[in-house]
Amino acid sequence: MPRALSILVFPSFSLRYDSGAENGSCTMIKIARIAVTLGLLSSLGAQAYAAGLVVNDNDLRNDLAWLSDRGVIHLSLSTWPLSQEEISRALKKAKPSYSSEQVVLARINQRLSALKADFRVTGYTSTDKPGTPQGFGQTQPADNSLGLAFNNSGEWWDVHLQGNVEGGERISNGSRFNANGAYGAVKFWNQWLSFGQVPQWWGPGYEGSLIRGDAMRPMTGFLMQRAEQAAPETWWLRWVGPWQYQISASQMNQYTAVPHAKIIGGRFTFTPFQSLELGASRIMQWGGEGRPQSFSSFWDGFTGHDNTGTDNEPGNQLAGFDFKFKLEPTLGWPVSFYGQMVGEDESGYLPSANMFLGGIEGHHGWGKDAVNWYVEAHDTRTNMSRTNYSYTHHIYKDGYYQQGYPLGDAMGGDGQLFAGKVELITENNQRWSTRLAYAKVNPKDQSINKAFPHSDTLKGVQLGWSGDVYQSVRLNTSLWYTNANNSDSDDVGASAGIEIPFSL
């Protein structure tokens, strides 16, 4: 795989659980309990401190993007989770010119307070799963779920304990109970190091990421990234601008082909100009039962000595680049272009056998209301034509999927997607949205893709509304229709979700 990306440092953690996900979750919960105890003891008499990780949240991202693409704040939104310190740093430097921008700033602070509340109850129910691939922060692993979360954070720690009970599982997990979303984290020298089940997202897309999305259940593992993304102070590196990295090492759950396989990855982003953000990402599927797990095997994969086609090659890798170009700094238009390219192979030290994503987005004011929109296209075929190659591997035969759901693009490999969405957010924080999607999925009926197990052409429309129904109690509703020939989902469906934050 692309050795040119080997500057993305991968830690060689070896995570192994004797009984799969359940023991992994128990270990994670024990560690989190210890962290909570330490956090509570340290917080006695201390003032509240805005610190910690902020996991994938669609409402928060849209509001931050609305401000960022209008030049009110400067913040990278292509690597999730974000750090609360970086969000706070950006908000403190905000330069609002209109009342609508002040409304959005207030709404972001309100959303952060809800997400990081001391206790948070969430519920979700639906008639079936939506018939089209779902985008950033929209995946629900079950038709019905109830979650309870406890948050505690300070200057150097962040603990998020979460327990969920589910019914009508879409992504089979072997149990109705799980700790998806739970983690404990500590900060040192401006670096956050966390352990738990944290969803990730790498790239500028809204409908998906070609290399690291959130269409599957989060894996259990470690994650490390910067707290604040300040530019280098060294004079000869200042041109890099604000930058961020993220390194993760996780273990796959219920991966039958090679049990206990690891996912090790790294991402680096930088902003040399206010109008341009660049990113590079790399992932390696490595190790597992019956596979080499020595340092030399890891090093061979890290340095790109793979793709031999033999049974003892180090692992399965993907790597690629992405960009976002904003028109606001030069033309004053709140419109941006973005793209992503991810390859399964290497040629000339660069990704080859590529998949592609591209889009355009806009963020406008309408009185004190806000309008967001985007149009996006994906092609997860190899070089926009070849099939049975993307997200597959001759050793890791279950492919780049966990429990049958892709770690990359939500539709899996060999698909094509065209989608657009318009969202109106009123001054009183009601969100109205309309999404149109057209997708061709799984043309070769690959059995490893359980998200869309049959070849199909999907044409769908999705309507959404959310609002505060009582103080900070928030209701989210959705209604959709999908025209499909071979879908396991109902053509017409609806869902409702509720969020109830409590602060002590």
UniProtKB/Swiss-Prot annotation:
Database matches in InterPro entries: Caps_assemb_Wzi (IPR026950), Wzi_sf (IPR038636)
Protein name: Uncharacterized 55.8 kDa protein in cps region
Superkingdom of source: Bacteria
Provenance organism: Klebsiella pneumoniae
